[in-house]
Amino acid sequence: MSQVNFIVVIPARFDSKRLHGKALLNINGKSLIEHVYSAALKSDAKETLIATDNNQIQEVTENFGAKTIMTKRTHASGTDRINEVAELECWEEDQIIVNLQGDSPLMPAANINQVAKLLSDSPDTGIATLATKILDPKELEDPNVVKVEFNESGLAISFNRKVKSKSNQMYWRHLGIYAYRVGTLKSFSQHERSEEEVAARLEQLRAFDLNMEIVIQEASLVPGPEVDTEADLNVVIAIMANN
């Protein structure tokens, strides 16, 4: 099986609304962003970069050896930030980029490789991403857990923070990881954000505005939690202390 040619970019902001300065929060002796970077290095990516608009983050990430690209402060989303990186690095239009969220320190390398291959195997699809089954009913009520619906072909139908009406159907949690080609990034970033995207704080809704298909697979491994809140941080600290 031929290996997919892909690059990982980790967008990292300091001014997170839900957990201020979380990229630099200490988790068992290392910053959150260093743990995410280490997770990415375990994948088959040919290169891993960090994209930030913060000098403090840049200093920390360069000190642990990460190639770090300084970007504008005005970007509306991590995808928009990564598009600037693609322009600065002059990547080819068909280069596959994996956007690994800067709050995902427990993302398995297998999932990073999986989402890149999913896009590579879907030449007519704009974006690829992953999901896991929601087994804890509390997650249905948690707005930090993004719910995704997709059809039998694996194409996304909707993304929501709230479940509008509960039923016995299987609910899926959207994971903070995307793969797209540089050409898709450009189209995405040139399009204005809709009121719905802004209100929901879900950048992937812009793809629907552009009629881009988003293909989804169940993640090969269930990752640990993303760090959105103080409670998440404490859970991740405990998990990493035991590993």
Task: Pin down the residues of each PLM region.
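Short, acidic/turn-prone active-site loops that include or flank metal/cofactor-
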Residues: F14, K72-G78, L221-P223
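Short, high-confidence coil segments that cap the C-terminus of an alpha-helix
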Residues: A45, E92-D94, S122-T125, M212
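Conserved alpha/beta core of the MobA/IspD/sugar-nucleotide pyrophosphorylase nucleotidyltransferase superfamily
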Residues: Y171-N243
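Short phosphate-binding loop-to-helix
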Residues: L49, N55-K117
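Conserved core of the sugar-phosphate nucleotidyltransferase
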Residues: M107-E196
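N-terminal glycine-rich phosphate-binding loop and ensuing alpha1 helix
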Residues: Q3-T52
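Short, structured coil segments at secondary-structure junctions
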Residues: D44, F64-G65, L210
